[in-house]
Each structure stands twice: as structure tokens, then as C-alpha cells.
Design a protein with these regions (language model features):
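Conserved glycine-rich cofactor-binding loop
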Residues: 46-47
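Conserved glycine-rich Rossmann-like NAD(P)H-binding loop of the short-chain dehydrogenase/reductase
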Residues: 60-75
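The beta1-alpha1 cofactor-binding region of Rossmann-like NAD(H)/NADP(H)-dependent oxidoreductases
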Residues: 88-98, 130
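Conserved NAD(P)H cofactor-binding loop of Rossmann-fold oxidoreductase domains
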Residues: 116-121
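Substrate-binding pocket helix/loop in short-chain dehydrogenase/reductase
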Residues: 124-125, 132-134
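Catalytic loop of short-chain dehydrogenase/reductase
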Residues: 160-185, 190-198, 208-213
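C-terminal helical subdomain
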Residues: 204-207, 224-280
């Protein structure tokens, strides 16, 4: 890696995360946090927030089905959680329809669907080719919408859909143009879902910097070093990062609250790291 960061030592949590994931709190039984027995499909469950959420949901008594591209990782996790694993590329509409229908048939319906999949290509905007743009939109924006479309006929009364977005929408960083633009498109698509289906609680969660994800997996380290320097100059390096298991449990609580209070929905939620917080 080129030495371009002499004044800004690299925080390796930001680059590589923390692969350890704490179990969720299985003792939660209050009506506002209870998800026991909920039939839940978690898309993007092979790593990061999706994986942590699946683990926490299982610990809190939910029945989970897991979907992601990396079926080898998914199968191991599903076995641990007594759930089912489904290979899924969310840029493939037919695959989405097949997986959602299969899970709904196994469960007899869906109480919650969670979408955490994301494509995050790191490249300067002039180096981002059309194929990359189209794939990123297909995963992050169109894929999420098609999941909702496929799930709609199978959603039980008072079912909830939760979709992970990014707190960087409207404040883009250098080197992540396709990701930021696709997440902005996702936000507008979800607004349209709420406008056309006000009966369906669609919770859009803007998630800030989080430890324990694989957002930088496969990225060019030399490019990241240069980008890190630019982000530092622009004040875009987070002083703190949220723990992935805390984010996961917060997301599950949003689902529980929406199901416990059917006349309201947390339409837009922002999750940001708490500065100076200490893990208990």
C-alpha cells in the first residue's frame, strides 16, 4: 500500500471491520420488542448487518430464512440457526421471485422481510464504467424494489418490510459515486412504495458507519488509501462506528414496534454512531 497517509493513520476497523458478532439479547419479551414466532426473510444474510440481524432474530425467537449470493457461508449459518438457506443474486428478477415464493410456501406467509444486500464498487467517477453503474443500480435500487414486488402477495396482515439505505445519501464521498447514486434512487423508490401502498409498513433505515461489515471486501487497497486521505481532508472519517450487533438489534426493534403498533410506521429512520458511547 502506498504511504500517503502519514498525517492520518488508518483505522483498520474502518477498512476491515470486526468479524466478531455478539448474540442478540434473547430475554426481550416486552410487546414493543417481541418478535417471537415472526416468519422473517433476511436478504443479504451471509455477512455484516444481515448476518448479525439473522443471528439476533433467531435469538429473539423469530423463524428465519436466509438469502444471499454466497451459499457456502449461508448454509453454515442457516444450520446454526435452524433456518433455511437460499442462494440469491438480487440483480436477477427470476431468482428473486423463486426464492420469495419458496420461503413464503415454507412458512405459510411472511411477517417481515429485511433487505440488506448492497453492491459497493470503489472507483473514481471517471473510471466507473456503464456495466458497473447498471449492476449497482440493479442490486441496490431495482433489486430491493423487486423483492418488495415479489413479497407483496405473501405478506401477512401487519407484515413489515425493512430496507437498509445509507446515511451518505445527499453527502457523497469521493470514489463511491455509483453506490451513493443508487442509494438515492432506492430512497425515491421506497417513497413511491409508501405512496402507492400506504397499508404496507415500509421502513427505510439510513445506516451510518458500522463496524463488522464487509463493505470494503475486494476493493483496491491502493485506491482506498488515496480515498481515505481525501475523506480525512473533507472530515468524512467517522470518529466512532456503530457495532454491527447494535445496528441489527435496532432494526429488529423497528420491526417489533411497527407490528405492535399497526396504526403507525417508522417511515424513515436514521442510525448514526453515538459519539463517546461505550459497549456494555
Amino acid at each position: 500500500m502506498r504511504q500517503v497517509l502519514s498525517n492520518h493513520p488508518i483505522d483498520h476497523r474502518f477498512f476491515f471491520g470486526n468479524n466478531g458478532i455478539r448474540q442478540g439479547n434473547p430475554g426481550m419479551s416486552d410487546r414493543q420488542s417481541n418478535i417471537t414466532g415472526n416468519r422473517m426473510l433476511v436478504i443479504g444474510a451471509s455477512s455484516g448487518i444481515g448476518k448479525a440481524l439473522a443471528i439476533a432474530a433467531n435469538a429473539r425467537g423469530a423463524r428465519v430464512a436466509l438469502a444471499a449470493r454466497r451459499i457456502d457461508l449461508l448454509s453454515t449459518l442457516a444450520e446454526q440457526l435452524d433456518g433455511s438457506a437460499h442462494e440469491l443474486d438480487v440483480s436477477d428478477p427470476q431468482a428473486i421471485e423463486s426464492v420469495v415464493a419458496d420461503v413464503a410456501a415454507r412458512f405459510g406467509g411472511l411477517d417481515a422481510i429485511v433487505f440488506t444486500s448492497a453492491a459497493v464498487p470503489f472507483a473514481l467517477i471517471e473510471d466507473t464504467d456503464v456495466t458497473t453503474w447498471l449492476h449497482t443500480y440493479a442490486v441496490n435500487a431495482v433489486g430491493a424494489s423487486h423483492v418488495l414486488r415479489a413479497a407483496l402477495p405473501h405478506m401477512a396482515d401487519n407484515a413489515v418490510a425493512l430496507v437498509a439505505s445509507s446515511h451518505d445519501v445527499g453527502r457523497p464521498r469521493a470514489g463511491v459515486a455509483a453506490y451513493h447514486a443508487s442509494k438515492a434512487a432506492l430512497d425515491e423508490i421506497l417513497r413511491s412504495w409508501r405512496a402507492e401502498h400506504p397499508e404496507l409498513p415500509v421502513i427505510r433505515v439510513s445506516i451510518g458507519p458500522t463496524e463488522g461489515t464487509e463493505i470494503l471486501r475486494g476493493a483496491d487497497r491502493d485506491l482506498l488509501a488515496d480515498l481515505y486521505r481525501v475523506w480525512a481532508q473533507e472530515g468524512q472519517i467517522p470518529a466512532e462506528m456503530s457495532a454491527v450487533e447494535d445496528v441489527a438489534n435496532a432494526l429488529l426493534s423497528f420491526i417489533a414496534v411497527a407490528r405492535a403498533n399497526p396504526t403507525v410506521v417508522s417511515d424513515i429512520v436514521h442510525l448514526a454512531p453515538r459519539t463517546g458511547s461505550k459497549q456494555v
